[in-house]
Design a protein with these regions (language model features):
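N-terminal Sec/SRP start-transfer signal
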Residues: 1-11, 36-77
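Peri-transmembrane interface segments
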Residues: 2-17, 90, 264-320, 329-331, ...
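Short helix-loop junctions at transmembrane helix boundaries
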Residues: 6-31, 367-409, 420, 424, ...
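Hydrophobic alpha-helical transmembrane segments of multi-pass inner-membrane transport and secretion
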Residues: 63-90, 300-336, 359-368, 417
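Hydrophobic, regular-secondary-structure patches
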Residues: 74-166, 187, 192, 273, ...
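Mechanotransmission and gating elements of multispan inner-membrane complexes involved in transport
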Residues: 134, 153-163, 204-307
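Short beta-strand boundary microenvironments
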Residues: 161-205
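Transmembrane alpha-helical interface segments in multi-pass membrane proteins
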Residues: 320, 327, 332-381, 406-414, ...
Length: 438
């Protein structure tokens, strides 16, 4: 019989955690309101509140053991939120890079620009497709581009410390295709010359990317002409004239992709249909929003898996700390609990009281961990090798309200498990045995 009760208890725990994980904050608020109503309006609820009040009033006497729960859970929440904020910041940076009124065309079955290649004839045909916006001279707003890897010395690094940056060769219409890109220092590069404009993120990460300075790329000296800002992944790149980049790196007349500005977002369908129906072309067509969102998925998933794995490992430690602390608290209050049972308190108020005490400590730990994660990591700059590129992507960690809520749910879940088993043990404690032993 005891085995069946314990098995049912485990099932209840698993089911409760499964529901809690997917519960939105309005659902949690509703549960809190229902619990408060039960505590205030029912006899057993008032009994549970009385017992919980006694336990909470003794927390000062158990400050050390209580701090173990709070600090442990705060650590879990802080680390979890920080790692998930990294995934959120990475994903957000790539999502902001694209839009629905720009399209990108690559060779068919290419997963990214790095793996794509378009010959000169294909590039010419793509620029003539329907749906592309045109400038005042009637020229299509299409930028044939290629990407190559370049190594540059890192800022604040040793003499031999280098990092990979993505060098993008762009066409003359690149600025019109991406109007969000603004020069913040210097000027644009001159077509036909070995000149560069560098993203703000790349300038922060690599040494020598200052207007007027020379850097060596592909065994050639290049002059840095300016610095641009865009608020997206492009800030991690450096740009040069596509023809010059192709000559320097032996790419001939081929290009990795063609990025176009559409006449309007609704024109994408006609643009894609025209290219896919052309028997001379074998290409993949997507909006830049879809392309960069897809590029972010794999790395975002990896970072989230790492964050959750680390969080689970730390949560197990915090949970055992909570179990140990609450079992000790129940043992120390065995006579008090037995006396309450003897004068008519049922088992349910005792269970709820112990659970409330543990959940209160867990809530405090979750709030502390969430606040620390927001203060320390929100907006913190980081960089990593971006999926589908050959360079580092600079981004900022983003601690969102959703991530803070996720951390708080983890904290309360740890408190729930850490308090439930000691609470059930307290409720099952035989009254006569407890009074006789103590």
């Amino acid at each position: 019989m005891a085995f069946v009760r314990n098995l049912l208890l485990v099932v209840v725990v698993v089911a409760s955690i499964a529901v809690w994980v997917v519960l939105p904050w309005p659902g949690a608020l509703l549960l809190a309101v229902l619990l408060a109503a039960w505590l205030l309006l029912t006899r057993r609820g008032r009994q549970a509140g009385s017992v919980a009040g006694v336990g909470i009033s003794t927390l000062r006497q158990r400050l050390g053991s209580s701090a173990v729960i709070v600090v442990g859970i705060a650590g879990v929440v802080g680390v979890l939120v920080a790692l998930l904020a990294m995934a959120e910041g990475y994903s957000e940076t790539l999502r902001k890079t694209g839009s629905r009124d720009t399209g990108i065309v690559m060779r068919g079955a290419s997963a990214s620009e790095v793996m794509s290649g378009l010959d000169h004839d294909s590039v010419v045909l793509i620029a003539q497709a329907a749906g592309i916006a045109r400038d005042a001279k009637g020229e299509p707003l299409a930028s044939p581009e290629l990407v190559v890897a370049a190594n540059l010395p890192l800022k604040n690094g040793g003499p031999d410390d280098e990092g990979s940056v993505q060098l993008r060769g762009v066409g003359e219409q690149a600025w019109a295709v991406r109007p969000q890109i603004k020069l913040i220092d210097g000027r644009r590069f001159q077509p036909g010359l070995r000149e560069l404009v560098v993203g703000r993120g790349a300038a922060r990460q690599f040494a020598g990317l200052v207007p007027g300075r020379e850097v060596r790329l592909g065994n050639q000296k290049w002059m840095v002409a300016g610095v641009f800002a865009s608020g997206d992944a492009m800030e991690s790149e450096i740009w040069g004239d596509a023809n010059v980049v192709a000559d320097t790196y032996g790419r001939g007349s081929s290009r990795a992709s063609v990025t176009v500005r559409l006449a309007d977002p609704q024109a994408f369908g006609a643009f894609k249909t025209a290219l896919e129906a052309n028997p001379q072309l074998k290409v993949d067509v997507s909006t830049t929003l879809d392309y960069f969102s897809k590029q972010s998925e794999r790395m975002t998933k990896v970072i989230r898996i790492i964050g959750i794995t680390v969080g689970v490992i730390m949560a197990i430690g915090a949970m055992f700390g909570a179990l140990n602390t609450m079992f000790a608290a129940v043992a120390a209050r065995a006579r008090e609990i037995a006396t309450l049972r003897a004068i008519g308190f049922s088992g349910l108020p005792v269970v709820v009281a112990v659970m409330l005490e543990t959940m209160l400590l867990a809530l405090a730990g979750g709030l502390i961990g969430g606040v620390l994660a927001w203060l320390l990591f929100n907006g913190y700059g980081a960089s990593t090798l971006a999926a589908g590129t050959v360079g580092q992507l600079s981004f900022q960690l983003h601690v969102t309200p959703e991530l803070l809520w996720t951390g708080l749910k983890w904290a309360l879940a740890i408190g729930f498990i850490g308090g439930l088993f000691p609470a059930v043990r307290a409720a099952r404690l035989p009254v006569t045995t407890a009074l006789r032993e103590l």
